[in-house]
Amino acid sequence: MEISSHQSHLLQQLNEQRRQDVFCDCSILVEGKVFKAHRNVLFASSGYFKMLLSQNSKETSQPTTATFQAFSPDTFTVILDFVYSGKLSLTGQNVIEVMSAASFLQMTDVISVCKTFIKSSLDISEKEKDRYFSLSDKDANSNGVERSSFYSGGWQEGSSSPRSHLSPEQGTGIISGKSWNKYNYHPASQKNTQQPLAKHEPRKESIKKTKHLRLSQPSEVTHYKSSKREVRTSDSSSHVSQSEEQAQIDAEMDSTPVGYQYGQGSDVTSKSFPDDLPRMRFKCPYCTHVVKRKADLKRHLRCHTGERPYPCQACGKRFSRLDHLSSHFRTIHQACKLICRKCKRHVTDLTGQVVQEGTRRYRLCNECLAEFGIDSLPIDLEAEQHLMSPSDGDKDSRWHLSEDENRSYVEIVEDGSADLVIQQVDDSEEEEEKEIKPNIR
């Protein structure tokens, strides 16, 4: 038969012994403050103490002292009280420190409780936020006239009381009525003076809507000017003169920060304008490189896959990018600095020949050809003709490519680990226009 109260009674007795320093055989020093405890209790409750006390298990006759600098005494007090009572005193101010100390002491139960506490606190704050906005929406619907007078009360003129009290929804404190005249603000208590001008309410609503739409989008000064012209032309039947209307709109636009827009009632929502910033949408699956265009991602993937789809028609060397091929051709071949591959001496079409060895082609001078033996090396006469200056009929085509070479290089590379299929295509037309493909000479 199990007695459930025995465990709590035993913990209570151990806690009393700790408070009275009875049979305490372990001292914990935390930033100069000493805590007394029992080694058996610490051994059973903390993985760190279990490892620490196991190393000194042979010296049980002497008291053990442990020193910590990773957390504060107040934090360790909360943890030690939990060890002896099973009650964890968490608040919004100490939950992070307690969770950090519990992680250091390898107390998984305390870490789980701290995580649950943080999550529940976030849920409560979200619920309170939703409740606040729902109440503000209801108040805005029930007090629409007062809300409209809060933002557009400057359309009418009238004397205000020397001092007026703000309602709790608008703020607290006492504000002078005349001090708000330059901001076109009239408190809600002046509703009686605004009733004779109720015929301007549709006009004010339209201006508020226009202002909301204009401020909710990233705009410059030109947008504000265009919105002013739209407001002036949209309602020509207004009894307010053009000069008063222009002055009112200017005051409203100038007094409103660009990064904010009005919501219902007195709610103000911050706008960060994320559409103005470039969106990086393509991420490399092999590294952290991020690009804006798919063509740039395909070009970047060649450094991982080792693809070299652009061969040099003069020497057969392959490149991963078209601009690298163009730079190679300009600096090596088009510069007319033909050298022998073996002796590195300058050669011409008369003093050297093009030799093809497998897929590679290079030049050798006549002396080096005589050393190797001209019969033992294959001479590519057709390649030598390609290295000559192109004929007049071929000047329009910058590259002397066959029909098979003119096809776009399309290769499929499959990566089983990432389940990624990469299709390499030609660079965009924009890049092709920028690239200069010189004649082979």
Curated annotation (Swiss-Prot):
Stored PROSITE patterns: BTB, ZINC_FINGER_C2H2_1, ZINC_FINGER_C2H2_2
CDD domains, A to Z: BTB_POZ_ZBTB8A_BOZF1 (cd18329)
Region (Disordered): 143-251
Alphabetical list of InterPro entries matching this protein: BTB/POZ_dom (IPR000210), SKP1/BTB/POZ_sf (IPR011333), Znf_C2H2_sf (IPR036236), Znf_C2H2_type (IPR013087), ZnFinger_BTB_dom_contain (IPR050457)
Comp. bias intervals (Polar residues): 143-170, 178-196
The keyword Transferase appears for this protein: no
Name this protein carries in UniProt: Zinc finger and BTB domain-containing protein 8A
